[in-house]
Design a protein with these regions (language model features):
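Regulatory and interdomain segments flanking nucleotide-handling catalytic cores
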Residues: 1-262
């Protein structure tokens, strides 16, 4: 077999499955913890500040490492990363838009960052944290906003169920709790939570109820010589507004209107 012929044939196999995104469209990457119910079983339930710390550090690393990343949003063990490659005519997509490479790289960055932060902060996990990742494009920035609205609505429903589930487990068996919560709406679960435990759902932290985000924003920097300057810095926002009621908040970040033009 001729070496060149073999190389070309194998290369053709690879090219067939090297799917790429259409250029100049926003890329959404959804990164999920694999088997995190077991991995995080030693952490406080229903809400853990330690876990939030790990997820926030992971978002920071993703925003810093992924070309074109402008916004990251997390709730539970899921991170939604928004990347753009249409800011200028010359802007190129990360990894030339290769779906496989974008997904594999983001899952690797998330896994190593989460583990590194856990080790540095002495946070106990069961086994090694592993993230999976999938990516897709949406037609415009308005659909990016709608994607994030949908994610935050899912976060609300998840946090309501999680709060109700784990607080009721302090009084009842697993089977009883499962049967009690079955087919209840989020509003009914909130009422049940208060009736059974006296806990107001809104007393939980905003980051548990609405999720947390990471993005670049202008910050005033103080220098040792007494001077000051404004720079764009990656920031964590753990007190988010309700996206559906504050669309401008998301739009300004996604479109870069909140960024200082240096």
């Amino acid at each position: 077999v001729k070496v060149n012929t073999l190389r070309e044939r194998i290369s053709e196999y690879e090219k067939i499955y090297d799917y790429r995104f259409i250029r100049k469209l926003p890329i959404i990457t959804v990164i999920n913890g694999r088997s995190f119910k077991k991995t995080t079983s030693l952490l406080k339930k229903p809400f853990s500040e330690d876990f939030l710390k790990l997820m926030c550090y992971t978002m920071i690393r993703l925003l810093a490492e992924v070309d074109g990343a402008v916004f990251a949003y997390c709730y539970s063990d899921e991170i939604t990363l928004v990347s753009r490659n249409d800011q200028t005519h010359e802007t190129e997509p990360w990894y030339n838009g290769s779906i496989q490479k974008i997904s594999s790289a983001t899952s690797s960055i998330a896994s190593t960052s989460f583990l590194m932060s856990a080790l540095e902060n002495d946070i106990n996990l069961i086994g090694d944290p592993i993230f999976t990742s999938s990516s897709f494009v949406v037609p415009n920035t308005m659909e990016v906003v709608n994607t994030l609205i949908n994610k935050q609505q899912s976060a609300f429903n998840y946090s309501v169920h999680s709060a109700c589930y784990f607080e009721l487990l302090k009084k009842y068996t697993y089977d009883t709790v499962d049967d009690t919560l079955k087919n209840l709406t989020s509003e009914e679960k909130i009422d049940l939570l208060f009736q059974e435990t006296g806990i107001e759902f809104n007393s939980y932290s905003s980051s548990f109820r609405k999720g947390a985000a990471c993005y670049r924003a202008p910050k005033l920097i103080d220098h040792q010589d007494g001077s000051q300057e404004i720079k764009n810095k990656i920031t964590i926002d753990a007190d988010l507004p309700t996206f559906s009621k504050n669309i401008d908040f998301l739009s300004e970040i996604i479109t870069g209107k909140n960024i200082l033009k240096l």
